[in-house]
Amino acid sequence: MSNKIIKLGSIEIANDKPFVLFGGMNVLESRDLAMSIAETYAEVTQKLGIPYVFKASFDKANRSSVNSYRGPGMEEGLKIFEEIKKTFNLPLITDVHETYQCAPVAEVVDIIQLPAFLARQTDLVVAMAKTGAIINVKKPQFLAPHEMRHIITKFNEAGNDEIILCERGSCFGYNNLVVDMLGMDEMKQSGYPVIFDATHALQRPGGRADSAGGRRAQATELARSGMALGLAGLFIEAHPDPDNAKCDGPCALPLHQLENYLKQMKAIDDLVKSFEPIDTSK
């Protein structure tokens, strides 16, 4: 098995390369907050020497309540993304939910994300593939790791081989997610880069009646475990005031903890990738 390398400017995304951070905020709450959070991430990752891609959503289309905050929408969101890219010289990742969003979003951001709940939607997959952008596929909570090959095949047959696979937890009964560490290793056998969404994996879906709950206090432990697998990247969301975040605050890392958190993740990644592989199948 050879590891596929996805090139994003000077950044190389692959399971055997130094990990790339995909991080930012859950949803764009305001232009000023997005700029402030992007600046913090940019400063910390530059200081630690971690390749970095800024993440935020312009629309959270799958909220628990019709009254929940969804974001500024595509038009305003893309303006904010353009300003972040220009100001901080950062590559960008965001998610799309409708086929008509794919082309205009891909003109601004570098990686477009296929949401977990939509990962089997063929029309959306084809529209995303046709943009030629790098694709981040969130593994659905209801799919086995080996079933990701079907989504990979769809993208390949639609003409796109620039694919990243993202683990974000699996359903475990009602209102709970667990992370199958061996499942991530199984996805790595595809050769495609695998990244770990360590904050969304902390969710308790529907755990707060009209919104998702979470287990922010365990953000470090879960991410440490994932990084020990030798992954292509880590996906996290942070907020300066998680308790008052407009979406997924219970899962968000407190922004002031970002540097110490990433120091540990980098140390684990560096150590694990310094080891010689051991083939225990023989």
Swiss-Prot record:
Pathway info: Carbohydrate biosynthesis; 3-deoxy-D-manno-octulosonate biosynthesis; 3-deoxy-D-manno-octulosonate from D-ribulose 5-phosphate: step 2/3; Bacterial outer membrane biogenesis; lipopolysaccharide biosynthesis
Domain of life: Bacteria
Gene3D superfamilies to which the protein is assigned, alphabetical: Aldolase class I (3.20.20.70)
Single GO cellular component term: cytosol
Main location: cytoplasm
Gene Ontology MF term list: 3-deoxy-8-phosphooctulonate synthase activity
TM helices/strands, residue ranges: none
NCBIfam families, A to Z: KDO8P_synth, PRK05198.1, PRK12457.1
Membership in a protein family: Belongs to the KdsA family.
PANTHER family (UniProt xref): PHOSPHO-2-DEHYDRO-3-DEOXYHEPTONATE ALDOLASE
Name assigned to this protein: 2-dehydro-3-deoxyphosphooctonate aldolase
Organism: Shewanella oneidensis (strain ATCC 700550 / JCM 31522 / CIP 106686 / LMG 19005 / NCIMB 14063 / MR-1)
Lineage: Bacteria, Pseudomonadati, Pseudomonadota, Gammaproteobacteria, Alteromonadales
